[in-house]
């Protein structure tokens, strides 16, 4: 079986979707009778796409954001899988035509591309993976509301109506897709995550951050954007520091349009450390150095990697009670789910005061995540859809 895992965004961008593409292609290609390759648009396309994307979000484009991981590192992680880049849509159509099935993200960009520029009838069956939330719950900003309007509109339904099926990751997205696309094959399978393997990486990696072992170390990691709750993070820091500044230190890993605000907070507070982007190979060691991980995402996640990564190192997590996070965190077991900013602050103080959850977090997350089972389910769905489409 030949599978193309397609994403317009190049793998060097090193986001969650790109990480999924690499891991999934590598695992599937290691199985007998399966060849899964990553296919993206080329560097020139990504530069233009990145500029337009930044313009849409009213921010300056930073070229470095599409080159966070080297091609050499990517190809090493891919194993037997290949990485193909296409310069134009004619070249892309030809490349995708060599496969039996295409797996693509559900972004409206890809839906428009397949419907208007390539043509669903000119390529093998396409499955959309909902790695972008189909609908943000509690959306409060202009862009999140516009996203919800677009993705639940007749326009998106028309652009995606020729897909062979949907792979959803969260329960919320599965329900939304089933309402909008009645009768379509929809499966919910969590993104594969190897908790044991991730913890092993921490033993081999050098710590990318320096910590004060006498302090309670709080880690935050992600893109510095409104969606990820940077404004809430900064407010939480201010409130916790009012009473616990001498006991805690904050380590913020990531970059984005709100990097300046984080840098300003680091200048204001001696216990706030802004580390910028940390490469994926080094992040396990950053989690291992922390006492608590916090996620301030606001509108829901399809698949929150960071809480699982933290848990795999035995680190508890505090997040808001939103979709994605509340499917990973069992409140009071491997972390706490806050229903308000006040609760979030109190949970952090509770941990900083020396309190601990009474469970084995590492053991718990290993039970909740089974990478082999997830890959098996995903491949079975691919096979079922291919058999159905060929009848």
Feature names for model-found ranges:
Residues 330-342, 349-355:
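Conserved acidic donor-binding segment of nucleotide-sugar-dependent glycosyltransferases
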Residues 7-14, 27-83, 321:
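N-terminal strand-loop element at the rim of the active site
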Residues 93, 134, 146-166:
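Membrane-proximal helix-turn-helix segments that form the acceptor-binding/catalytic region
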Residues 104-110, 130:
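Short His-centered aromatic/hydrophobic patch
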Residues 316-319:
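Short hydrophobic beta-strand element within catalytic cores of glycosyltransferases
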Residues 277-278, 286-290:
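Short alpha-helical donor nucleotide-sugar binding micro-motif in glycosyltransferases
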